[in-house]
């Protein structure tokens, strides 16, 4: 277990721990408690530790070999900003079937690892990655199934602020792992820079 990347209150303010009223057996181990209204609350320590694990893994790949996908509206701005900061390929918005499997498709790409904002809404990308043996890192909420997911980041993958915070933390950690930022150096961007503006 590692130290928190940011103070606990910042995680809580972004709603990173807020799950849904549904839960899957797969996600049970990441659930801290169930509120009286039936809402499942994620364990912030698990979220924090999995962000660190994912960043370490992603930092071992060339930026050009990483594809980050989000069909979910609140994930599109964070994914674009993450791509700008880390140099990774991104597909914010609709994922066209065949992007990873059809060499005849004009925008066909062959990443070595895939990151998705929600394995359910980004299921086409996950399926194509699995067909090609590409590992999948996924932001997963309490109701997600983990089949075809290799690295789980247990977080609220529906909230605008929560998704932005996760991609901000991932970007910062990857830059630290790559030695672009030192561990005590401040990141010159804020989580709000990753948020969808409404």
From Swiss-Prot:
Family listed: Belongs to the universal ribosomal protein uS2 family.
Organism, as annotated: Methanosphaera stadtmanae (strain ATCC 43021 / DSM 3091 / JCM 11832 / MCB-3)
Keyword Repressor attached: no
Keywords carried by this UniProt record: Ribonucleoprotein, Ribosomal protein
Keyword hit for Cytoplasm: no
Gene name in the database record: rps2
BP term (GO), one: translation
Protein known as: Small ribosomal subunit protein uS2
First and last residue of the signal peptide: none
Gene Ontology CC annotations of this record: small ribosomal subunit
Listed PANTHER family: 40S RIBOSOMAL PROTEIN SA
Gene Ontology MF: a single term: structural constituent of ribosome
Top-level taxon: Archaea
NCBIfam families (UniProt xref): uS2_euk_arch (TIGR01012)
Pfam families the record matches: Ribosomal_S2
């Amino acid at each position: 277990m590692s130290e928190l990347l940011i103070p606990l209150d910042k995680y809580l303010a972004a709603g990173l721990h807020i799950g849904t009223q549904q839960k899957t057996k797969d996600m049970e181990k990441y659930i801290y408690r169930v509120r009286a209204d039936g809402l499942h609350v994620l364990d912030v320590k698990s979220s924090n530790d999995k962000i660190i694990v994912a960043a370490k893994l992603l930092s071992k790949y060339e930026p050009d070999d990483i594809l980050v996908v989000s069909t979910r509206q609140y994930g599109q701005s964070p994914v674009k900003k993450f791509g700008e900061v880390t140099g990774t390929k991104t597909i914010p918005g609709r994922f066209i079937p065949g992007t990873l499997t059809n060499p005849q498709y004009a925008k066909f790409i062959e990443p070595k690892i895939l990151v998705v904002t929600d394995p359910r809404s980004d299921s086409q990308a996950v399926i194509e990655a699995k067909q090609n043996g590409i590992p999948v890192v996924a932001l997963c909420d309490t109701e997600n199934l983990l089949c075809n997911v290799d690295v789980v980041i247990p977080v609220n993958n529906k909230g605008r602020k929560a998704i932005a915070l996760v991609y901000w933390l991932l970007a910062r950690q990857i830059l630290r792992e790559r030695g672009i930022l030192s561990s005590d150096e401040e990141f010159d961007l804020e989580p709000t820079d990753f948020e969808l503006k409404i």
